[in-house]
Amino acid sequence: MSDYSSISFKNNGKLKLLIIVGTRPEIIRLAAVINKTRKYFDVILAHTGQNYDYNLNGVFFHDLQLADPEVYMNAVGADLGETMGNIISESYKLMAAIQPDAVLVLGDTNSCLSVIGAKRLHIPIFHMEAGNRCKDECLPEETKRRIVDIISDVNMAYSEHARRYLADTGLPKERTYVTGSPMAEVLHQNLEKIEASDIHQRLGLEKGKYILLSAHREENIDTEKNFTSLFTAINKMAEKYDMPILYSCHPRSRKRLEQSGFKLDKRVIQHEPLGFHDYNCLQMNAFCVVSDSGTLPEESSFFTSVGHPFPAVCIRTSTERPEALDKACFILAGIDGDHLLQAVDVAVEMNRNGDLGLPVPNYVDENVSDKVVKIIQSYTGVVNKMVWRKY
């Protein structure tokens, strides 16, 4: 049984905030928020251990100048069910021990299920990236989005689309806010380092003459039919464009490729996951970025806004960020070979012709962390009074 008795807040008179993360995307998106909340609140950052090794998580604490988490829960189990159970159990024990005034989570990961314990302990829950919906029930994230949205006391959405989804669910409008995406703030703070990265020299790549690939989502990697379709399409892409395809390869994806025996075209270069500055430098200088990452639309919008547009193609058939399609920031291509090649052609030609789309206003806000601090400070007491009747 885990012992969190040695963990405690500073008790400096400030609001005691517990922030829970477990994956690389959460750390990246929350970086500016974590640093800002540490200025104004008494903060404990807890990592569930859901997705931890240096390349997946540790490098980002370094790149983004984040202090190491105060707590590692080591919640990974023998299988997914055990891991989810451990996350709920360990986070409950931690919260019972340290008694935070509020809990902050972001997104739709297994680590976000920690809010179940917070609800049981009557701790106000604040959820960023609330209301995202892709309407594809095959995605495990879609189920977790609904669970976390409904359990949370205050939902902070990226867009009006997301706010409408929350309203349609019947969640209280008076505790739902549109903050915008936190990614622009993180990217702005790191833009000089991104532009100064020497990753092209280190990898021997010429700017504008390579395709950057990221493919790691469960529906693309773990489903046999989709896996074969996707990587057959990638081989076709290598053959058609005859240039290096740099694949930033998640360990799970690498293991799946090795187990399958699938033979990638020699122009597809598998590389361990890249650091924040290096990956974004590669993005903004690529012939095309082909990715199933949820942040691709946000990154495309941001780099367009600062004069570094890149052709962005998403290898999915649904999106939880329709506002980015509203502004023509990326193309949904799916994983079929012909459709993917058509999408890359269109994205590259439009970029070349200056048909860049427009930045999504909610994706270029630079004060999201300020909004989050003020919402948490404003509503912790309100939730305690109106929901839990504490006073």
Locate the predicted segments by residue.
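Nucleotide-activated sugar donor-binding and catalytic core shared by glycosyltransferases
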Residues: 1-243, 253-391
